[in-house]
């Protein structure tokens, strides 16, 4: 099975300064490999203290996001696992293929509220079908990246939206890991909804596509592994000299 050279990879890493996040992809040519819609998917998240890792000399730039397990990254970062972080997930819409000018691309449904939060308008839509509006990955990526650049307003709105509509995953364990399986296929919004007491910042939200594919385009995979990162500021008690 090979769909290489048919995929333009757009990494979600650009959305949230995150490392090794699953890609949303555009398929630019017809593929004989089809998604098995009878399957479900899973999302696994690894949470690490990248500030401490970098200070200890770990070269985090050596790790490339693929959406698949990276044993080397896990081994290098295991000492910096964050326990007690809570992530929430929400299936925000369907993923469909759209043919245009002899090419096929993936398009993604987003609910009206998320469109408004990201600043997407009807003129940005790649397709409208009844009450459903679809956008390309490039549109979603660019809008989210821009909205998260300068302030926390967008992040706060997405966290609030997730608090009202999302489902919390189990808190990360001692290895910094949490996961959820048996998820219907589609586009998911992931938000960190609770940080441990000694951490002052949460990771920026990101999207995950189920199923996904990596840059090689060998096949579709239904179990996506995310390694989001952020620089933490740890709370410390003041000392009196």
What are these regions (language model features)?
Residues 2-235, 241:
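Solvent-exposed loop/turn and edge beta-strand elements of beta-rich ligand-binding domains
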């Amino acid at each position: 099975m090979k769909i290489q050279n048919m995929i333009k990879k757009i990494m979600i890493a650009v959305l949230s300064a995150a490392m090794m996040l699953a890609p949303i992809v555009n398929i630019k040519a017809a593929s004989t490999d089809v998604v098995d819609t009878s399957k479900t998917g899973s999302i696994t998240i690894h949470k690490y203290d990248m500030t401490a890792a970098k200070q200890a000399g770990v070269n985090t730039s050596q790790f490339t996001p693929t959406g698949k397990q990276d044993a080397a990254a896990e081994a290098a970062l295991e000492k910096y696992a964050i326990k007690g972080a809570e992530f929430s997930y929400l299936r925000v819409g369907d993923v469909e293929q759209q043919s245009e000018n002899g090419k096929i691309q993936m398009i993604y449904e987003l609910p009206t509220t998320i469109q408004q939060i990201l600043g997407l308008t009807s003129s940005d839509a790649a397709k409208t079908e009844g009450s459903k509006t679809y956008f390309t990955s490039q549109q979603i990526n660019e809008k989210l990246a821009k909205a998260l650049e300068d302030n926390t307003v967008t992040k706060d709105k997405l966290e609030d939206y997730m608090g009202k509509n999302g489902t919390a995953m189990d808190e990360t364990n001692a290895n910094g890991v949490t996961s959820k399986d048996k998820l219907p296929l589609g586009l998911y919004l992931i938000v960190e909804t609770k940080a441990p007491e000694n951490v002052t910042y949460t990771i920026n939200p990101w999207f995950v596509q189920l199923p996904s594919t990596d840059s090689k385009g060998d096949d579709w995979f239904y179990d996506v592994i995310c390694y989001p990162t952020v620089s933490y500021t740890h709370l410390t008690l003041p000392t009196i000299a």
